[in-house]
Design a protein with these regions (language model features):
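Alpha-helical transmembrane bundle of multi-pass membrane proteins
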Residues: 1-216, 223, 229, 233-501
Length: 501
């Protein structure tokens, strides 16, 4: 089946990313609903709204960390399915809420589900992708996040045309997510498991069968055999390293470095400020004098711009220009846009100067464009690529949970308060971080992983599987069977407990 099957598989798995985008974006329009604000006796800039969004991010942090355990023990497929089932329960609770507690519990469950899927979907995609197209395949995750934002915005926009006396304004958008959640939960039963996970569990014949299904084009049998040999030898070498629990990720120098890269790329993504805009852009537009249905209409257009840009980037550019250059470009460009946004806002505090308001909307839009040309797809691709197989589940869980969702929880809680209290000065926090911390870190320390197999990336960080594998590992042909010993593949067995850290 080859490339078309791989793309279809990755796109369907990215339904989990769609739910990530939908659940992240749905509250943008829900908090515009007068019926919702009246029903829960709150305002847009209250701590209650911050709590609704921060409980979602907090749940996602927990889900991401838990996902590391389920991915390693039960597989990539199971983790995605678990997230989909939990999302379904969260959708039911939110849409049927009779009080604030039900909304908060529903948001925690939705966040938990999104946390599971946000770290498992990119890993699953990276492990089924061909090295030449991995950027595009994993980039589909960010594409579906964007589509989720689009759908949530237009579903919300349409629902807000219901009378202010109707709870349909907010119950229907919260219920809609149950449809893709159910589709994903059932559909993943028919999808194959990651071949790398199958090799790790000793299911060698099944792993080879799936590799052929994913990549065979009628002429590349030798390449598939070489890829299989490399995957198998690498995983056997890494299994020779005693790696129980989570602490080992911090004790082995190479793994610690690679984990840090994964965490930092997620932190830097959050510090662009784009998710703050995603959650609270309607508040920002209100400050610019754009109110009523015009407000949600502008938000809907905003949420279309990013995914369109992202699609163009992942199809035509990502696997050509690499990872580092787009992220450095995005850091500089987003910072300039944030500074310009703050400057215009500072001269239009009452939102009555139309020209300044238009300029403010323009720079908010440019932020999502620059983000979609850089951190949007690159952060997920880079995180999935830099993790070694032996800690890939736990490593991606930790990077997503701490780097992405813990930071998101903080900004979700404080942003509505900050936008009300310090207004335009809030944007300078993100610009300063980007220019003073993100840019030099990427320039001096991040590696270029483009066009390399997941096993070849080991060499960028000091050697294959902690330097235990020979350079010609791809040409070796380990014997089949679970009874193999490490020394039969030419691998030196090392116990981490006796290594100098």
């Amino acid at each position: 089946m080859g490339r078309s099957f791989t793309i279809s598989l990755a796109a369907f798995a990215a339904t989990g990313s769609f739910l990530f985008g939908y659940d992240s974006g749905v509250m943008t329009d829900v908090i515009e609903s007068k019926n919702f604000l009246s029903f829960f006796n709150t305002t847009q800039t209250s701590s209650i709204i911050g709590a609704i969004n921060s409980t979602f991010s907090g749940g996602a942090c927990i889900g991401s960390l838990q996902g590391g355990l389920t991915m390693d023990r039960f597989g990539r497929k199971f983790t995605i399915q678990m997230g989909a089932f939990i999302c379904l329960v969260g959708a039911i609770l939110q849409s049927s809420a009779k009080n604030l507690a039900m909304i908060l519990v529903g948001r925690i469950l939705a966040g938990w589900a999104v946390g599971l899927m946000s770290m498992s979907v990119p890993v699953y995609q990276a492990e089924v992708a061909h090295p030449r197209s991995r950027g595009f395949i994993v980039g589909l995750a960010q594409q579906m996040v964007g589509i989720g934002f689009i759908v949530s915005t237009w579903v919300g926009y349409g629902s807000l045309h219901a009378p202010d006396t109707s709870q349909f304004q907010w119950r229907f958008p919260l219920a809609f997510q149950a449809v893709p959640a159910l589709l994903l939960a059932v559909g993943m039963f028919f999808m194959p498991e990651s071949p790398r996970y199958l090799v790790e569990k000793g299911q060698y014949d099944e792993a080879m069968r799936i590799l052929r299904k994913l990549h065979f084009d009628g002429t590349n049998e030798d390449w598939i055999q070489t890829e299989y040999n490399e995957i198998k030898a690498t995983i056997l070498a890494e299994k020779a390293v005693t790696a129980p629990g989570w602490l080992i990720m911090f004790q082995v120098p190479q793994w610690r470095t690679r984990l840090l890269h994964g965490v930092l790329v997620q932190v830097f993504t959050q510090m662009t400020g784009v998710n703050v805009i995603g959650y609270y852009q309607t508040i920002m537009y209100n400050a610019l004098g754009i109110t009523g249905n015009r407000n949600t209409l502008v938000a809907g257009i905003y949420n279309c711009v990013g995914p369109i840009t992202n699609l163009i980037f992942i199809v035509f550019l990502l696997d050509r220009v690499g990872r580092r250059k787009p992220m450095m470009f995005g850091t500089i460009a987003i910072s300039i846009a944030l500074i310009c946004e703050a400057a215009l806002y500072s001269q239009n505090l009452d939102g009555t100067r139309k020209g300044y308001s238009i300029g403010g909307v323009f720079f908010i839009f440019t932020i999502t464009v620059f983000f979609s040309l850089s951190f949007g797809p690159c952060s997920w691709v880079y995180m999935a690529e830099v993790m070694p197989m032996q800690i890939r589940g736990r490593g991606n869980a930790f990077a997503t949970g701490i780097g992405n969702w813990a930071v998101s929880t903080l900004w979700s809680q404080v942003s509505p308060i900050a936008l009300a209290k310090i207004q335009y000065k809030f944007y300078f926090i993100f610009a300063a971080w980007n220019l003073c911390i993100t840019l030099p870190t990427i320039y001096f320390f991040f590696k270029e992983t483009n066009q390399k197999s997941l096993e070849e990336i080991d060499l960028l960080f000091g050697g294959r599987a902690l330097g235990m594998l020979p350079e010609d590992v791809g040409k070796r042909n380990p014997q089949e069977g679970e009874g193999e010993k490490a020394d039969e593949t030419g691998i030196t067995v090392v116990n981490v407990e006796h290594m100098t850290v």
